[in-house]
Amino acid sequence: TDATPEQVHRIFSNSRIIGRRFKIVHVVFSGQNIIEVTTFRSNSTAKKGKINPTRVSAESGMLLRDNVYGKSIVEDSQRRDFTINALYLDPVKKEIYDYNGGLYDMQNGIIDIIGDPDTRYSEDPVRMIRALRFSAKLGFKLSKRTSDPIKRLSALLLEVSNARMFEEVIKLFITGHGYNSFKILRKY
């Protein structure tokens, strides 16, 4: 949506804004069902010499905060991690919008990162773990450009907070695909 998290939260009283790095809204329906609502993201950056408090990065390039909002699905799709996570559904028209080849990758069992892998992994090193988790869970292969930088850039994971790493590692093993996750982790 092009609505900000704060606007979504005002519309749905049964919601809460979560995340510091990437704000999203969890809307609770029927007691337990959670719908995750995200605002379109933008690739725009602060002008040279200007401070942009909505996008902050470390010296390594890791995004510490990225709440620069966009206005279009196309722009937002370029900020997603993998092509299969950049598919958009219009529930009224019952149409899927795909700007990055995600349908092809889904049909062919491929996990492919969007954009330059080195840049994208530097922005958020957890993307490396997410790639491995999706591969283990879905039985998909990592594209060469997605897998090749993982060993080389794995030290970037040391910059991720302990709490966030704990959360991501737990996800590797609670999806019912723990053995596959273990095998793929050993590979990398």
Give residue ranges: language-model regions.
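Catalytic cores of the polymerase beta-like nucleotidyltransferase superfamily
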Residues: 1-188
